[in-house]
Every structure is written in structure tokens, then in C-alpha cells.
Amino acid sequence: MRVGIIGCSGRMGTLLSNLLRATARFTLGPGFSRTSTHSLASVIDNNDVLVDFSSSSLSEELFRALLSNPKPLIFATTKPAPSSSIDEKIEDLAAYVPVVVCPNTSLGAYVQKRLAALLAAVFDDAYDIRITEVHHRGKKDAISGTANELVSILCDAKKKEWQQEYRVGADSDSVKNIELHASRVGNISGEHEIAFISDKEQITLRHTVFSREVFAEGVLRILDWLLNESPPPGCYGPEVGLKVSV
């Protein structure tokens, strides 16, 4: 299986390239970056599967090109703003090929999301919710894709279990707010913290990444799943490569 990386010259693209070179079951194909000599169309044409580690500014262009020449995609970058049409384009592409949407491919992040949904269903409106995410100063997007995903998970759980609307940055009395903070400092690979806080107690879920290799290894697990399972077209999450049922 020939793997092409979109964003091949970035931190994650470089890490994944090195990991792929060390494996016998995958071949590193031509990649794309803003400074590469390959066009986006030629990279898509000359690979069996694509991994996107670029940025949200490229997403619209990438999906337009993929809809002209569908290839399986691991979409591992932050989605553009909700006003974009990316969700619709993901669904369109997933009608033809497998699309794995995973802004965070680590096992710890997946478990944190599942626990967050559980706690959101347990704690009522007496508990305020705060999300804090910290990354290295070179990370361009804020809020991170993982933090945005956590917000969606919490809002869905609150609406389902408590019939209560939650959102970020709302000022209506009928809407509960999720406090959300982002920081870009130093060389921190990634930290996400969710706190449920009442007048009497607090419970906190924190996931900290010490090495970016954990993300590249997560992508490799998803590639193994694509290679071994040959899944049908559809939209999938990062759990497909984790072999977990929690």
C-alpha cells in the first residue's frame, strides 16, 4: 500500500514519513506541501491512501481534488470553521471510499473523549464545565481539533441526557456555557483538560502527550486497519485502529 502525506514537510508529516520508511508493509509515496514539487492532483493519483497532516486552510482544495479522484483518506487535521462545507464534503467523499476523521489519533485522547461523554451524562447543571488545551507555540490552529471535538461530545451528551442545550461563548440564560481556553507556549506536544466544577467539588480529566510519535503510531494503526480489513466506503473514527470497545 502506497501512502501519501499531505503536509509532508511539517512536524507530523516528517515523523510519519520516518515511521513508514521503517515498515515493510507500507511504501512512502510522493507527498504534498506548499513547497513541494508535486501537485496535489499528482500526489492523489500516485498513492493508494492519503494522510492529511496539513492545516485547515488546505482542506477545501484537498476535498475538491479527492472528489475528482477518490482515494481513502485519514483526515488528521483540524477542521475549518463550522461555516465551511467540509462536513458535507467528507460525507460526499465517504460515499466512494473510507474516510477516517481523527484530529487526535492517540489512545489516551480516545479514552478521554469516552470518559467525558460519560461524566457529562452523570453531572447535572450544578456542575460548570471548563476545557483547557495547551500546545506548542508553532501550532497555528486554536482552538484545536481535539478541543472542538470534546465540545461537540459534551453538548451532545447534555442534550441527550439532560435535555439541556450547551454551547461555547453563549450568553443566553437558557443556555449553559462551556468555558474554553487555548494556550500556545513552548514546545508542548499537547494537553487537554476537562473539569466539571460545582460549588462543593471538582473532577478533572487530563490527557498529556509527551511525544508526537504517539500520533504517528496511531495513524499507522489506522493504516493497518485499512490494509487488513478493506473496509467499505463510509465515515469512520480513530477507534477503528485501536481495537477497543469502551
From Swiss-Prot:
Domain of life the protein comes from: Bacteria
Q: Give the molecular function GO annotations.
A: 4-hydroxy-tetrahydrodipicolinate reductase; NAD binding; NADP binding; oxidoreductase activity, acting on CH or CH2 groups, NAD or NADP as acceptor
A single GO CC term, please?
cytosol
Pathway note: Amino-acid biosynthesis; L-lysine biosynthesis via DAP pathway; (S)-tetrahydrodipicolinate from L-aspartate: step 4/4
According to its UniProt record, this protein's enzyme class is: oxidoreductase
Q: Where is the active site?
A: H135 (proton donor/acceptor), K139 (proton donor)
Q: What is its EC number?
A: 1.17.1.8
Its main subcellular localisation, reduced to a broad class, is cytoplasm
Q: Which GO terms describe its biological process?
A: diaminopimelate biosynthetic process; lysine biosynthetic process via diaminopimelate
Query: What keywords sit in the KW lines?
Result: Amino-acid biosynthesis, Cytoplasm, Diaminopimelate biosynthesis, Lysine biosynthesis, NAD, NADP, Oxidoreductase
Under Pfam families, the record lists: DapB_C (PF05173), DapB_N (PF01113)
| Compartments in which it is found | Cytoplasm
User: Which amino acid positions bind NAD(+), per UniProt?
Assistant: G7, C8, S9, G10, R11, M12, A76, T77, T78, C102, P103, N104, T105
- Reaction catalyzed: (S)-2,3,4,5-tetrahydrodipicolinate + NAD(+) + H2O = (2S,4S)-4-hydroxy-2,3,4,5-tetrahydrodipicolinate + NADH + H(+); (S)-2,3,4,5-tetrahydrodipicolinate + NADP(+) + H2O = (2S,4S)-4-hydroxy-2,3,4,5-tetrahydrodipicolinate + NADPH + H(+)
Q: Record-annotated residues binding NADP(+)?
A: R34
Q: Which residues bind (S)-2,3,4,5-tetrahydrodipicolinate?
A: H136, G145, T146
Family label: Belongs to the DapB family.
Q: What does this protein do?
A: Catalyzes the conversion of 4-hydroxy-tetrahydrodipicolinate (HTPA) to tetrahydrodipicolinate.
PANTHER family the record matches: 4-HYDROXY-TETRAHYDRODIPICOLINATE REDUCTASE 1, CHLOROPLASTIC-RELATED, DIHYDRODIPICOLINATE REDUCTASE
In Swiss-Prot or TrEMBL terms, this protein is called 4-hydroxy-tetrahydrodipicolinate reductase
Which source organism? Chlamydia caviae (strain ATCC VR-813 / DSM 19441 / 03DC25 / GPIC) (Chlamydophila caviae)
